Amino acid sequence: MLRAERGGILNVRSLASLLPIPDFAVYAASKSYLTIFSEALRLEVRERGISVLALCPGPVHTGFGEAAGRHGEPPETPSREWFYVPKEEVVRDALIALQGDRARLHPGWRAASLAAAISLLPMAAIRCMMRHRPRRVES
């Protein structure tokens, strides 16, 4: 890409990157790292014609939860189903954002709204919510 002076890099984050989530500390921290890494890399390669996008899609039906061994309430539960972003929408929006030289993207209005709301909350409120959230059930 550097020789060709064109191309794009897509780093997949998570809404978990915005929250200190019990039982997901390493996952959330690694996704948070991607945010700053992507921003710094973008500054390094932008003048060489390379785009860098930090994609934060929120929940998408991909089979990741099952592969990761998550237990507890299934993702098809009606209370959560409305929040999922169709994978086709994520891919379409990511490609458009990458071509448009966007730095970050939360595809779908639900994920974008939640990310905006989280950014406005004080950390004390976020900690309180995380302490009282349902914990995953071990089998």
Which residue ranges define each predicted feature?
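SDR active-site lid
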Residues: 43-110
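Active-site helix of classical SDR
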Residues: 30
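A short helix-coil junction within the Rossmann-fold of NAD(P)-dependent oxidoreductases
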Residues: 1-5
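Catalytic tyrosine of NAD(P)H-dependent dehydrogenase/reductases that use a Tyr as the general acid/base
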Residues: 27, 35
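A transmembrane-helix-recognition feature enriched in membrane-embedded lipid enzymes
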Residues: 101-136
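Active-site loop immediately N-terminal to the catalytic Tyr-X3-Lys motif
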Residues: 21-25
